[in-house]
Amino acid sequence: MNIAGYIDHTVLRPTTTLADVENCCREAAEWGFAAVCIPPPFVKRTKTILEPTDVKVATVIGFPFGYSATEAKLAETVLALVDGADELDMVINLIALRMGDWDFLERELKLALEIIHSKGKIMKLIVESGILTTAELETACRRFGPLGIDFMKTSTGYAEKGAELDAVKNMRKWLPPQVKIKASGGIKTYAFARQLVEAGANRLGCSASVQIVKEAQNG
């Protein structure tokens, strides 16, 4: 398994520096990761660094808690696209989800999707599967999957739980086949990364990416 091709090499700490991002880009180019996932202020610089490579530039919207006003999320989305983002990982409004306001969530998602897809870019919807009930996760998959999202992503990495095998398996069962899955949060070893892919993950959000690939190479 070419695990590197599944990885979004991630640096999203609140204290992230330009040097951190530049190092992330160098590692991504060297190891052949699918994308880097970096904070919005660094998108333009990252795009310039990675222009000669096949590595995609991913960033986050409404991160990490998702309860920004819709207008703020859409403004972030537009700016990220202008700066050169290829993929946008948007956090769902968990307050609205917990209150059962599924219609609001669908409206917000459709507005973001319209902007992102009009530029031919990729949307990943972060749902924080680790803090949802099984019923909430199933409803999210069945309602949002058919709307045109490209990926559903398990976690921000800031909740109590990150990627879990059962969640990925359930998401694969409940989502339309064309919707991919990104597992993220707490992926530290090649063994776990491989298990997640075998469970149905198409992409992995990792900060321990180099360590994981080295483990894979060493068997």
Regions found by a protein language model. Name each.
Residues 184:
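Short hydrophobic "strand-cap" motifs at the C-terminus of beta-strands
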Residues 38:
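N-terminal beta-strand-loop-alpha-helix module at the start
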Residues 1-31, 35, 43-63, 67-181, ...:
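Alpha/beta enzyme core
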